[in-house]
């Protein structure tokens, strides 16, 4: 059974949509999905300016320097773990340990 994910993106978060028509956005996303051999169903609500993506195996959509990239569930999990390790780098733990070690030497 294929997992279908519905993504709602507010248009204000993606300023490039002001310069793209619905057809241009669909062609750009479909071009990405053709490379990945996936299909996507895109609907843009003209009233609320939200995009509705009905994606198979895709959770997040990123727009960076004119390129739309889609990340699947496993890829996004890997990216999240990398982001978590960046937010808590091991360098701070080691430097803190070094400070504690210096304090220990000073007390003795």
Swiss-Prot record:
Residues 74-108 are annotated as: Disordered. Residues 84-95 have a biased composition (Polar residues). The lineage of its organism: Eukaryota, Fungi, Dikarya, Ascomycota, Saccharomycotina. Present with 623 molecules/cell in log phase SD medium. It comes from the Eukaryota. This is Uncharacterized protein YNL184C.
């Amino acid at each position: 059974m294929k997992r279908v994910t519905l993504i709602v993106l507010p248009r204000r978060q993606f300023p490039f949509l002001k310069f793209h028509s619905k057809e241009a956005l669909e062609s750009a996303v479909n071009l990405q999905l053709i490379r990945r051999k996936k299909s996507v169903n895109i609907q843009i609500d003209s009233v609320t300016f939200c995009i509705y993506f009905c994606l198979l195996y895709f959770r997040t959509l990123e727009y960076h320097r004119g390129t739309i990239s889609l990340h699947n569930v496993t890829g996004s999990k890997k990216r999240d773990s990398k982001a978590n390790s960046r937010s808590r780098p091991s360098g701070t733990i080691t430097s803190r340990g070094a400070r504690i070690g210096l304090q220990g030497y000073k007390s003795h």
